[in-house]
Amino acid sequence: MQDDINEGSDFAANASSPAEVAAFFQNNYPHLTIADTDAINKEYPLMPPLPEHAAYFPSASAAYGEATFTCPGNYISLSFANALPPDKVWNYRYNVLQASNVAAGLGVPHTFESPAIFGLGNADDDVNSSYATYNSEIIPVVMLYWISFVRDLTPNQYKYGSAPYWDSFGDGEDGVKTILLQTNGTIMDTIPEDQVERCDFWRGLAIIMEQ
């Protein structure tokens, strides 16, 4: 399972106020009550500004990304790890920055890793993107992890030579592990504790949101 660091940035409303964040969430999840959206705004207060966006876009983006992609992915990983041998489940976070995305206030948006998985020009991407220049070195790292999954059902047997060993997710008893994929800086990591707490919050709303 996976998530990009800024999963919500391509989808979130360009909100100027907590009320607009609340309206955005109620439009997407109509069973949410006013009390629910008040709680969401409390979990995601005003954040540092991002280029080309209104004041509460960062909050809307972070909330939507975690509610819709990141936290469900983490819980699916944990569910598989509890149902299968936990060493058969892997999780990653993708943090490859492209200057144009950063300048547009999008960070690392949903599915930005696709060209690294399938190769430059094979994923409806711009061949003039950063993957052709300063992010080119992440391509063999990511691609060979995926090829190894296909060939061996694990990411490590056929991984790129200098890429780190990708530890399995774990069973949640002693924390869980994820790999942080970054150009010239891929490392093993853990899911941040503050994100774990926010995911617990979203889990409490899962039935209402039909997630």
Pin down the residues of each PLM region.
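Substrate-gating cap/lid region and adjacent catalytic-acid/histidine neighborhood
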Residues: M1-T133
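Mobile gating loops/cap/lid regions near enzyme active sites that modulate substrate access
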Residues: T70-N74, L78-Q211
